[in-house]
Amino acid sequence: MLQGISNIFIMRLKFAFLLLTFCVLMLSCTDKKPVSQAQGISIGQKESTPVKRVNSVEVAKQKPLTYKILVPTAYRYCNPDTLINKNWVELYKDGKDYYVGKARYSIKIISDECGDGSAPKLLGKRNTILFVNQLPIRLGKVQAANIEISDTSYLVPGTTYSFTFLGKRYKLEAKAQGEDVFINYALLLNGERFFREVEAGDACFNFLFAGDLDGDSKLDLVLSAPTDYENLRIFMFLSSCAPPGLQIGKAAEIVDDFSC
């Protein structure tokens, strides 16, 4: 029995180490050249290899914009205090409108009974959706798509949004196989797959924002896609980071875990 407990403890330590490394890599992997899997693709990028899918992209970068993101929540493996600073901006909602402004935040230490006893919690001073280290857009009101976004509007398979944004028609679809556990879960934009999860559990995924974040009058997305209810995983997709032949590409990702 003691041997079994010891093995479980060792496995949890290994998981914690891997998650910590993953968190850091997701925030810094855009520094690598060339970029694979569309992470941190730059504006003004040069095409190196024609592709059709996001998960097979290789792009040579020229003066890249490296994106890092955080959301207002408690963290166990990521330390927001070493990442965010006064130069960051935030996407926030005021009434029905969305704005980008200078980041206004605070960090406090809270108790964490399942972790090391304490954890940093990043707090926004407004109705903050996302903190970003930089965005190629002027501060102020941003254009948002007219689709329903809420904490309970989950992207279950079969969900479809059809809308017009800044003169262009878009169709967002969620597809998957299976019922209790979704297999090959995918999100498509105008028929092009930009997100895929081999096994998505009950797929409690939802959009946090849909609109223009990079100033090119094209659709950008912020997606919450946790692997389970005790997991944090947020993606930022930008049209300016789209691989050749696609309309949107992953610009940044943040992952953390608060399971016991």
Stretches with model-predicted labels:
Residues 10, 17, 199-203, 218:
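Generic alpha-helix detector with strongest preference for long hydrophobic helices that associate
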Residues 27-28:
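C-terminal motif of bacterial Sec signal peptides marking the signal peptidase cleavage site
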Residues 15-24:
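Sec-dependent N-terminal signal peptides
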Residues 215-225:
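Acidic/hydrophobic-patterned starts of short beta strands in beta-sheet-rich repeat architectures
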Residues 33-211, 224-260:
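Beta-propeller-forming repeat regions
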Residues 2-3, 8-15:
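Positively charged n-region of N-terminal signal peptides that target proteins for export
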